[in-house]
């Protein structure tokens, strides 16, 4: 049962994080007449622009989080980012709060150590070799154990922050220092991951709902500096690789529990898959589903966590997304040349409405659907390059 927004019996959804993914979740909630409250650490974040109300808070502050939850009495608390006081969510969930998909999932996936130990040690899934380190001495030992080349990441970071590749012994000190600067909560623990040989990487959007576990077609993507630049669906895979990917994803999402969409990141080598990470929420590479599927990842997420069946996920054919990346400084960003960017049929531009930029920031995305994946990617990239950003 849903109440009507702004009325006495309104069904309220509290978004923790109000970026471009949260904005699309908010819009899907609005389509169901749900009342949306958006939180973030800065004002006028994208989801705040389409919410009924908003709050600017430090979401790592458990007391501030609890005060808003007590005030708003949401039916659903929906984390959109990792940097949240997850211990407080666990505590409040034990008192009856509905955290999407679960507070456990939010806490485990906030920290690379939690989810890696779950996947490798509890679920016995294939992962890259890894070691954790708290000090520089432990870090050097971890690098030696895992071997060079290797990848270094803070256990708590996102969007590539603090991540680097150690290619020679000379990189060890620099990699440690960079990881200490890039963590979400400042200096701290890191993971050292061994290099693995893979053909490509995918995001397998996996929905856990009242009518079971459902899979979207696999999404391929290209990363640069730890952030995605293009994604496409479907990624060509062998039948055995798809079965292995779905097996891995289902084990992970069932271990995390709850209802919603999960972005399961996997490396693929031939018919073999290697688990990388999982986000218990819509995934940035999944923005392609806004043009490639009948129900986008955001629609699927909202339908799942509100208890609706998913039934069948319809995929429309070769589609792609390409990021509109800004580089500059402004508190009054403008966009031009959009008519040329959208000159071709089955091409869409989504601008996120981010209020400011200082450096490099993802400001929008181009979505295309063509006869082939190659044409979809090429046209998406070309269209994105035509968008003129005025700082």
Curated annotation (Swiss-Prot):
It comes from Vibrio campbellii (strain ATCC BAA-1116). N(1)-(5-phospho-beta-D-ribosyl)glycinamide binds at residues 20-21, 80, 284, 354, 361-362. This is Formate-dependent phosphoribosylglycinamide formyltransferase. One of its GO terms (molecular function) is magnesium ion binding. Homodimer. It is an enzyme of class 6 (ligase). Residues 117-306 form the ATP-grasp domain. The gene is purT. ATP binds at residues 112, 153, 158-163, 193-196, 201. Involved in the de novo purine biosynthesis. Catalyzes the transfer of formate to 5-phospho-ribosyl-glycinamide (GAR), producing 5-phospho-ribosyl-N-formylglycinamide (FGAR). Formate is provided by PurU via hydrolysis of 10-formyl-tetrahydrofolate.
């Amino acid at each position: 049962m849903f109440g009507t927004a702004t009325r006495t019996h309104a069904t309220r959804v509290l978004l923790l994080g109000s970026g471009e993914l949260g904005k699309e979740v908010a819009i899907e909630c609005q389509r169901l007449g749900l009342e949306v409250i958006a939180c973030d650490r800065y004002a006028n974040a994208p989801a705040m622009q389409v919410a009924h109300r908003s709050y600017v808070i430090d979401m790592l502050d458990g007391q501030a989080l609890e005060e808003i939850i007590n005030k708003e009495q949401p039916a659903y608390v929906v984390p959109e980012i990792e940097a949240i006081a997850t211990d407080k969510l666990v505590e409040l969930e034990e008192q009856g709060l509905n955290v999407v998909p679960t507070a456990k999932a939010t806490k485990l996936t906030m920290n690379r150590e939690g989810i890696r130990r779950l996947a490798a040690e509890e679920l016995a899934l294939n992962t890259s070799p890894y070691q954790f380190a708290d000090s520089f001495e432990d870090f050097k030992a971890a690098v030696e154990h895992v071997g060079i080349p290797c990848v270094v990441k803070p256990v708590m970071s996102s969007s590539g922050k603090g991540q680097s590749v150690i290619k020679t012994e000379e990189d060890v000190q620099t990699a440690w220092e960079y990881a200490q600067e890039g963590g979400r909560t400042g200096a701290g623990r890191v993971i050292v991951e061994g290099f693995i040989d893979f053909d490509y990487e995918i995001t397998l959007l996996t929905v856990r709902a009242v009518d079971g576990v459902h899979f979207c077609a696999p999404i391929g993507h290209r990363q640069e500096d730890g952030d995605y630049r293009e994604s496409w669906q479907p990624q060509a895979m062998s039948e055995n690789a798809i079965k292995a990917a779905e097996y891995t994803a289902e084990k992970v999402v069932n271990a995390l529990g709850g209802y919603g969409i999960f972005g399961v990141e996997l490396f693929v080598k031939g018919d073999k898959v290697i688990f990388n990470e999982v986000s218990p929420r819509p995934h940035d590479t999944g923005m392609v589903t806004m043009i490639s599927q009948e129900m986008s990842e955001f629609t699927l997420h909202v339908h799942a966590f509100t208890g609706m069946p998913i039934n069948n996920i319809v995929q429309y054919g070769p589609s792609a997304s390409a990021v509109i990346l800004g580089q500059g400084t402004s508190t009054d960003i403008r966009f031009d040349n959009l008519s040329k960017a959208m000159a071709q049929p089955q091409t869409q531009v989504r601008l996120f409405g981010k209020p400011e930029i200082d450096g490099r920031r993802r400001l929008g995305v181009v979505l295309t659907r063509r006869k082939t994946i190659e044409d979809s990617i090429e046209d998406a990239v070309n269209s994105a390059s035509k968008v003129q950003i005025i700082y």
